[in-house]
A protein has these predicted regions:
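Substrate-binding and catalytic surfaces of secreted/luminal carbohydrate-active proteins
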Residues: 13, 104-108, 117-123, 129-130, ...
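Short acidic/polar active-site loop segments enriched in Thr and Asp
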Residues: 22, 80, 222
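General structural concept
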Residues: 22-33, 43
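Substrate-binding cleft of extracellular glycoside hydrolase catalytic domains
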Residues: 34-144, 228
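Internal amphipathic alpha-helical repeat/solenoid segments
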Residues: 10-16, 28-38
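Boundary/entry segment of secreted carbohydrate-active catalytic domains
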Residues: 1-23
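Soluble non-cytosolic domains of exported or imported proteins
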Residues: 6, 60, 93-100, 199, ...
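Conserved residues at the C-terminal ends of beta-strands
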Residues: 24-27, 85, 166, 276
Length: 330
């Protein structure tokens, strides 16, 4: 468990609605959470946990999971995406080979229910699948992941599924790779010009995203949609982790996404971004930063003030490691 102190799902649903958050990502398919978000306008991205990927190699198991864990709540609960595993491809072990077969079984189950066009599916990857690339137009995938990326990209293309990625400019800052203004969207001028394209960039988030855009384009997948399934900033645990920096990063990120116009290399592509995370996670393993990405405390008071706009019908997304105390891997 990553939390043992969270509010009840119906309280979380009320909080999310009150904050004008329109899109929520959870990391499992807990029935209490799915029930809590029924008859709301919130669009839900649900997840298959890494621990369940072995079971998802069986089509009959996946059919049963869809029938028992998803369909009873749909469409009253507006489930729009299913994520299959989380950052599994990064591990470079045998488990990575479970992802695409599991997704194939999910597709097959959705087709049986005639929902393949209504519920999209993919698997979130970390930016580790990209080679360190500068400038962005030199972006390529790391050859270490070739064996798993080739079938994954073909599968996503075949099913018109989005490429999901977790991007954290915070770690560029934490590793000393960048200036704070560049990472917090505070640079008013260009931080570099891509010599190959002549395009200038003024923040690290866009630069990281364009590395991915070019990596996909170099593989002839330039039309593949990208969803940033996690980004955020911790409030404690490192010299750059502070309430002030977290508020600045997420506020400026929201403004950047809402104002458009995409990234320098893909200016017409609408940005779809999920902020991690709704709550701090008091039991999460690892450095202190890992437990302090939340924008709310478990008592539902704000860690800092973040305004979620509703401009022209476009609203905001939040990734919640769990919307209650459920049996999660992280």
């Amino acid at each position: 468990n990553a939390n043992n102190n969270l509010p009840q799902p119906d309280q979380v649903a009320q909080l999310v609605e009150k904050q004008n958050i329109q899109y929520l990502r959870i990391y499992d398919s807990n029935p209490k959470v799915l029930m809590a978000f029924s008859n709301t306008t919130i669009e839900l991205m649900v997840g298959v946990r890494n621990a369940d990927l072995s079971a998802f190699q069986s089509q009959s198991y996946v059919d049963s999971w869809l029938r028992n864990s998803i369909l009873p709540y749909y469409p009253a609960t507006n489930i729009t995406h299913i994520t299959v595993g989380v950052e599994m491809v990064d591990s470079l072990d045998d488990a990575t080979n479970l992802v695409v077969p599991a997704m194939r079984n999910v597709v097959s189950a959705l087709k049986t229910a005639n929902l393949q066009d209504r519920i999209k599916f993919s698997t979130p990857l970390s930016s580790a699948v990209l080679s360190p690339s500068y400038p962005p137009s030199e972006g390529v995938f790391s050859s270490s992941y070739e064996n798993v990326l080739r079938p994954l990209l073909d599968f996503l293309e075949e099913n018109q599924s989005p490429f999901m990625v977790d991007l954290y400019p915070f770690y560029a800052m934490n590793n000393g790779d960048s200036s704070l203004d560049y990472v917090l969207f505070k640079s008013s001028s260009s931080i570099f010009v891509d010599g190959n394209t002549g395009l200038s960039c003024n923040n690290i988030f866009d630069a990281q995203l364009d590395v991915l855009h070019f990596a996909l384009a170099h593989r002839n997948f330039s039309r593949m949609k990208i969803i940033v399934t996690e980004t955020g900033w911790p409030t404690r645990g490192s010299p750059y982790a502070s309430i002030d920096n977290a508020q600045t990063y997420n506020t400026n990120l929201i403004r950047h996404v809402m104002d458009g116009p995409g990234t320098p290399a893909w200016p017409h592509e609408e940005l779809v971004v999920y902020i991690f995370s709704l709550f701090n996670e008091n039991l999460k393993q690892g450095p202190e930063t890992e437990r302090n990405f939340g924008i709310f405390y478990p008592d539902m008071t704000s860690v800092y003030n973040l305004v979620f706009p509703d401009k022209g019908g476009r609203s905001w997304c939040i990734a919640s490691s769990q919307a209650l105390d459920s049996d999660l891997q992280y």
